């Protein structure tokens, strides 16, 4: 039986309607100042439990008062434009109503965490990269959330133990990474070029499987 489902956040359960890319703007400002801005700088921004200004300070990016305000406004505009996909709201409700545990497992910077939690107040479990200091597909992030939920991944052939699924739009982070940790990862193809194209369909596949297993037991 499937006992838990992990969801990616951006591109899966939420979308950004007005992208301003404040962190990308910050990194560009650092390069403009002659700083060495590397992929590790971006990784730090996603794994540090720091506000936006704290990231700039840590990376040594000097911001004038006007530039700081400009980037802060860009961040707030992007945050305020985040909205849930309607199919995500329905799918999560259907899974939870059936007794399946639901969690969000996502790579994101600190300001985005409260927004996700606010949009889905009924989701109790979260694994956010900025809180854990690692990003997907590091196996620790998947193991952490499974531990929080009290589920044990890796039991696909043991009918006595619950199985854990994940779905998202990244092959590396939401399919391959989870599978390496014993979680059956699935890809969401919102462009309709794949077997799973929306989360309502995914939820019904999960519920149908559990129903079939109950009837066969």
Per-range role (PLM):
Residues 45-47, 80-83, 134-136, 194:
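Acidic-and-aromatic substrate-binding clefts and catalytic sites of carbohydrate-active enzymes
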Residues 20-31, 47-52, 71-79, 112-116:
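Hydrophobic alpha-helical core bundles mediating ligand binding, dimerization, or RNAP-core interactions
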Residues 1-7, 15-17, 62-65, 89, ...:
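Asp-based, Mg2+/Mn2+-dependent phosphohydrolase catalytic module
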Residues 39-40, 77-79, 129, 161-162:
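Short, contiguous strand/loop micro-motifs
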